[in-house]
Amino acid sequence: MNLVLMGLPGAGKGTQAGKIVEAYGIPHISTGDMFRAAIKEGTPLGLQAKQYMDRGDLVPDEVTIGIVRERLSKEDCQHGFLLDGFPRTVAQAEALETLLSEIGRKLDYVIHIDVRQEVLMERLTGRRICRNCGATYHLVFHPPAKPGVCDKCGGDLYQRPDDNEATVANRLEVNMKQMKPLLDFYEQKGYLRHINGEQEMEKVFADICEVLGGLAR
């Protein structure tokens, strides 16, 4: 089975990706992992990507697509894959369609884990970290026994600047603007399946399995 997994920050994409690859025996392929592997292996495309990344520039689509092609040609992808973090744009999605066609493959589904912005805000702004030992808490989902105090060492809990409301709201807005055209593209192609990501973790996974039920494991 050939899948793309989509969702905004805080939607639980990483958790569900882990469950999918374990249940269906396909590799979880993230953009970052692909780049790191290509750079480590010293492939020509990996070295090109490294030059851009070292300068803090975006890696051009042609290099990214080339690295995706190399990754999908590996033995562990013969029975399927789960792409996460790619494609990010309609141009990349179109290039992926072409690439898959050239190697005799096609996407089965694009799974979108759908969570309302206010729920994402609660999830992302609730994180608190111990200044002393680094333990992580969440005001709603994993609160400390005593507000503002670490259960483990008694240290002071704080909110990272990246987790404040203004920063999180901006991050979600940027991601949504980027993702919307991609969702529309895959909707028109008939690949897109929306999953309610506001449910319990196991129910989200059960709904994903229901979508994938017609595909061979």
Swiss-Prot record:
UniProt-listed GO biological process terms: AMP salvage
Biochemical pathway: Purine metabolism; AMP biosynthesis via salvage pathway; AMP from ADP: step 1/1
Gene3D superfamilies membership: P-loop containing nucleotide triphosphate hydrolases
GO cellular component terms listed in the entry, alphabetical order: cytoplasm
Chain sites annotated for binding AMP: T31, R36, D57, L58, V59, G85, F86, P87, R88, Q92, R160, R171
GO terms of molecular function: adenylate kinase activity; ATP binding; zinc ion binding
Catalysed transformations (reactions): AMP + ATP = 2 ADP
Binding-site list for Zn(2+): C130, C133, C150, C153
InterPro entries: Adenyl_kin_sub, Adenylat/UMP-CMP_kin, Adenylat_kinase_CS, Adenylate_kinase_lid-dom, P-loop_NTPase
Cited CDD domains: ADK
Keywords attached to this entry: ATP-binding, Cytoplasm, Kinase, Metal-binding, Nucleotide biosynthesis, Nucleotide-binding, Transferase, Zinc
Annotated segments matching region LID: 126-163
Keyword Transport: no
Listed EC numbers: 2.7.4.3
SUPFAM superfamilies for this protein: P-loop containing nucleoside triphosphate hydrolases
Region described as NMP: spans on this chain: 30-59
Main location per the UniProt record: cytoplasm
Keyword Kinase attached: yes
PROSITE patterns per the UniProt record, alphabetical: ADENYLATE_KINASE
Cellular localization per UniProt: Cytoplasm
Annotated residues for binding of ATP: G10, A11, G12, K13, G14, T15, R127, T136, Y137, Q199
Role this protein plays: Catalyzes the reversible transfer of the terminal phosphate group between ATP and AMP. Plays an important role in cellular energy homeostasis and in adenine nucleotide metabolism.
Domain text: Consists of three domains, a large central CORE domain and two small peripheral domains, NMPbind and LID, which undergo movements during catalysis. The LID domain closes over the site of phosphoryl transfer upon ATP binding. Assembling and dissambling the active center during each catalytic cycle provides an effective means to prevent ATP hydrolysis. Some bacteria have evolved a zinc-coordinating structure that stabilizes the LID domain.
Family: Belongs to the adenylate kinase family.
Complex and partners: Monomer.
Name of this protein: Adenylate kinase
Species for this entry: Geobacillus kaustophilus (strain HTA426)
